[in-house]
Amino acid sequence: MDALLTKFNEDRSLQDENLSQPRTRVRIVDDNLYNKSNPFQLCYKKRDYGSQYYHIYQYRLKTFRERVLKECDKRWDAGFTLNGQLVLKKDKVLDIQGNQPCWCVGSIYCEMKYKPNVLDEVINDTYGAPDLTKSYTDKEGGSDEIMLEDESGRVLLVGDFIRSTPFITGVVVGILGMEAEAGTFQVLDICYPTPLPQNPFPAPIATCPTRGKIALVSGLNLNNTSPDRLLRLEILREFLMGRINNKIDDISLIGRLLICGNSVDFDIKSVNKDELMISLTEFSKFLHNILPSISVDIMPGTNDPSDKSLPQQPFHKSLFDKSLESYFNGSNKEILNLVTNPYEFSYNGVDVLAVSGKNINDICKYVIPSNDNGESENKVEEGESNDFKDDIEHRLDLMECTMKWQNIAPTAPDTLWCYPYTDKDPFVLDKWPHVYIVANQPYFGTRVVEIGGKNIKIISVPEFSSTGMIILLDLETLEAETVKIDI
């Protein structure tokens, strides 16, 4: 490995002789860096893990019920008929009666064969182990059940509609249908919460030629057994510093690097402390070399030494090498910013919401992707059966759904660990971002979705360790360009 890096540095030094004078890099800073509270930040001294998750579900149902009712009243207002019968509004799930079309608002709950159970994990001494389950669904036995619930009880949802629409635990919706038999409800239509507001997208400024670009990377997954990842990281550093690209003007437009989680490959059950420290030291070296040239935000991810429950708190500064101490001064937050996961911010008026990707990875396990789209450009991973095509379109669909649901982590706390909030649910959106970034995905992809007249740019950021891919997001046009580093 050392020989490879030495050869790489020799080749780079030859290129340096031909480089023109360095350009001034575009400056990109969070518009509200010093004057806002982070909804995902947890005060260490005030944390209390003794509360029940009941409060989260109650807050979620109460908040979304008002939003969903507004939209349901527009679609199924008084006088709305179905097959000649008047459709009634039911205030409670248990008020649903037979042979009468009606609609009701409630929270979805999925009972699935392979969904993890905390009590079983504790009994079997597997609690806290990595979740290797690819799907919670019972594809062959058909034992899975989807229910609508509220404070009064539950009703089983049936019908063809639930096979073509994602129904995920924790999502609050309005359901139109009719009781098929006692305790079951035939679903005919679904209604999502009323559209959210969105800040106006900033207009071009004549005195400012460009808003610049931010580089997005996730899944560096540095470890002690994969030297190729370290070499890729070295090339990434040289690229961002403009040393392996003749288009220096283009590189100078990249004003910030956002590392979206999984910087190190850390599993507490299989990686010892010394191996972790080696990975963190290499990561620190990368930061030490690049920070004089470009500002960096660092989010934690599933593999990182951070909280295992959402929202993940920022890396602790003690994890980094002493060479970075000067950057942890509050005044240097513009240069090195250790942030939460999820992370919301605004760059030059562009609102961005970023997640490390565990939320979408978990939601994927609730849904069996359809095979109706034909062959995808992204082939199925080896070892996966042909009836489970987890392609980029499937994942973009689910990312879009989280915007429709206005909840970026609906499966928390059922199958996604989260902090037991008592008075709020920070994963519930109050406004839509301009850009929604989901990192550590198998594939790259983008999509512009329009909901209620508002446009949201969705970006799927792939793992760098397996794809060598970084994304350059233009804050002026919201175009996403890929750069691939092969070795």
UniProtKB/Swiss-Prot annotation:
Taxonomic superkingdom: Eukaryota
One Pfam family here: DNA_pol_E_B
Disulfide bond entries: none
Subcellular location: Nucleus
Gene Ontology cellular-component annotations: cytosol; delta DNA polymerase complex; nucleus; zeta DNA polymerase complex
Modified residues annotated as Phosphoserine in this record: 20
Major subcellular location class: nucleus
Coiled-coil annotated spans: none
GO molecular function: DNA binding; DNA-directed DNA polymerase activity
EC numbers, comma separated: 2.7.7.7
UniProt-listed InterPro entries: DNA_pol_a/d/e_bsu, DNA_pol_D_N, DNA_pol_delta/II_ssu, PolD2_C
Modification N-acetylmethionine, positions: 1
UniProtKB keywords: Acetylation, DNA replication, DNA-directed DNA polymerase, Nucleotidyltransferase, Nucleus, Phosphoprotein, Transferase
Any one of the GO BP annotations: lagging strand elongation
Swiss-Prot/TrEMBL catalytic activity: DNA(n) + a 2'-deoxyribonucleoside 5'-triphosphate = DNA(n+1) + diphosphate
Family in the record: Belongs to the DNA polymerase delta/II small subunit family.
Record's miscellaneous remark: Present with 626 molecules/cell in log phase SD medium.
Quaternary data: DNA polymerase delta is a heterotrimer of POL3, POL32 and HYS2.
Function: DNA polymerase delta (DNA polymerase III) participates in chromosomal DNA replication. It is required during synthesis of the leading and lagging DNA strands at the replication fork and binds at/or near replication origins and moves along DNA with the replication fork. It has 3'-5' proofreading exonuclease activity that correct errors arising during DNA replication. It is also involved in DNA synthesis during DNA repair.
Descriptive protein name: DNA polymerase delta small subunit
Organism: Saccharomyces cerevisiae (strain ATCC 204508 / S288c)
